Amino acid sequence: MRLILLGAPGAGKGTQAKFICERFGIPQISTGDMLRAAVKAGTPLGIEAKKVMDAGGLVSDDIIIGLVKDRLQQSDCKNGYLFDGFPRTIPQAEAMKDAGVPIDYVLEIDVPFDAIIERMSGRRVHVASGRTYHVKYNPPKNEGQDDETGDPLIQRDDDKEETVRKRLSVYENQTRPLVDYYSGWAENGNGAAKVAPPKYRKISGIGNVEDITGRVFGALEA
């Protein structure tokens, strides 16, 4: 099972990625983790990436694709792998295709933006314990206070509505075009690509976690 997980920030990709990886015995591939590991190990690509990062630049797609190809050679990828958060752009997707990275499925978890804004901006956190609440779906007994200690709850900066809207805007402009890219490739076939087109699946990310997980496995095993 080799797949890419698509969806907006707050769509629940991280939660479902965990269940998919457990079900199929595959690793979750994170470009951030790969970069850190390569830099730490001092590999040729890691050294190249470190120079760019130390200069305050963005690591090129060529370096990232090289890291991806190295990572997929490791033994834990023999049964497949899951990409979450990569590719983010059409050029990255094209580079993966040109590099011959095989993908069986592209799965989109679809959640309307207004639902994501409500979901994320309603989160509240008790900093000391990490306990989380939601003003609508899991409210504390007393508004703004942790159930066990009575301490004040906070809204993380990442969960503030303005921040959520900015992240969704970046997704809309940069990453959502991948939906059309992969669904079009799946529908229209291979062209001159080095790898077979993936199957494209889209599920609703609205509902409880168990229901969404059921939809995920139904889509991947259909």
Curated annotation (Swiss-Prot):
Any keyword Transferase? yes
Major site of localization recorded for this protein:
cytoplasm
Print the keywords alphabetically. ATP-binding, Cytoplasm, Kinase, Nucleotide biosynthesis, Nucleotide-binding, Transferase
Q: Which GO terms describe its molecular function?
A: adenylate kinase activity; ATP binding
**What residue spans carry the region label NMP?**
30-59
- Describe, as the record does, how this protein assembles with itself and its partners: Monomer.
Q: Which family does the UniProt entry place this protein in?
A: Belongs to the adenylate kinase family.
Kindly provide the name given to this protein in its UniProt entry: Adenylate kinase
